[in-house]
Amino acid sequence: MSAAAAETDVSLRRRSNSLNGNHTNGVAIDGTLDNNNRRVGDTNTHMDISAKKTDNGYANGVGGGGWRSKASFTTWTARDIVYVVRYHWIPCMFAAGLLFFMGVEYTLQMIPARSEPFDLGFVVTRSLNRVLASSPDLNTVLAALNTVFVGMQTTYIVWTWLVEGRARATIAALFMFTCRGILGYSTQLPLPQDFLGSGVDFPVGNVSFFLFFSGHVAGSMIASLDMRRMQRLRLAMVFDILNVLQSIRLLGTRGHYTIDLAVGVGAGILFDSLAGKYEEMMSKRHLGTGFSLISKDSLVN
C-alpha cells in the first residue's frame, strides 16, 4: 500500500436494537453533521472500532477489502440466546424442523421407480375416497359445487379489473396460469390411482389437465389476498374456508397430490406479490398518470 495514499477515519459505533435489547450486527459509518448537528449516514452497528480507509480499500480489511473484527457469535451471551428463544420462537421451531427433516431425508427409503408415489394427503383422505367411490352422485354434487366456487374466483378477479379498475388480481392470475402451464407441461405427473373424475368438474367434460400445481387453490389465494387488501375480511374468510374444503375434496378424489395444493398456496402469494411489483414499476415509469391497463386518453374520450 502506497505511503502517499489518502487516509480517512471511519468510526463505527454501537447502538441498541429491538432484536435483543443490546446490539445489532450491522455496520454504521458516522458521516458529517447537517445544519441541525445530526449525523448523516448512521446505520446500526455492533461494535466501536476505528478503521483507516485508503485508496486501495480499508487498511484493516482482509483479502483486499471488508472489515477485520470479531465474529458476531463471539459476542453472544446466554441472555441473548434466551431472548431469541423467547421472542423469536418461530425461527427456532423452523431450525428444529430443519434438523428433524434432515434426519428423515437421509434415512428414508426411496420410493421404487415403478411404485405409486407416497402421498400423506391420500392416506389421510382414504376414507373420503372410498365414500365418494361408492357414491357417484355425491361425487358429482361436490364436483359441481367446486366448479361454482371456481366460477366465483374467476368472477371476482375479472370484476376487480373491469368494474373497479384495479388490475392487480387479474395480472396475478395471468402470471400464475402461464407459469402453471409451463411447469405442468415440463413435468407431466401421472394421474393418481383411484382418481374419481366427474363430467361437471372444472375443467368441465373430463378433459385432461395439469397436476402441478393446483390452479384451483392458487386462484382462490389471489382472490382472497385482494379481498384482504380491500378490507373485505369476511368475504376473504369465506374464500379461505371454501379453499380448505376444496383442497380436501381434491385430495379425496385424487385430483391433485398434496404438493400440488401446497405449491398452489405459495404460487397465489408469489404471483400476487409479483403483480404488485409490476404495478409499482409501471407507476414509476408513468409518474404523472399512475398505473392503468387502459390509456388515460381513452378514458377522457
From Swiss-Prot:
One of its GO terms (biological process) is phosphatidylcholine metabolic process. Belongs to the phosphatidylcholine:diacylglycerol cholinephosphotransferase family. Disruption phenotype: Reduction of 18:2 and 18:3 triacylglycerols (TAG) accumulation in seeds by 40 percent. GO terms for molecular function: diacylglycerol cholinephosphotransferase activity. InterPro entries: AtPDCT1_2_TM_dom, PDCT1/2-like. This is Phosphatidylcholine:diacylglycerol cholinephosphotransferase 1. Functions as a phosphatidylcholine:diacylglycerol cholinephosphotransferase that catalyzes the transfer of the phosphocholine headgroup from phosphatidylcholine (PC) to diacylglycerol, a major reaction for the transfer of 18:1 into phosphatidylcholine for desaturation and also for the reverse transfer of 18:2 and 18:3 into the triacylglycerols synthesis pathway. The chain crosses the membrane at residues 88-108, 141-161, 171-191, 202-222, 255-275. The active site is at 216, 256, 260. It catalyses: 1,2-ditetradecanoyl-sn-glycero-3-phosphocholine + 1,2-di-(9Z-octadecenoyl)-sn-glycerol = 1,2-ditetradecanoyl-sn-glycerol + 1,2-di-(9Z-octadecenoyl)-sn-glycero-3-phosphocholine. It is an enzyme of class 2 (transferase). The keyword Transferase applies. The keyword Hydrolase does not apply.
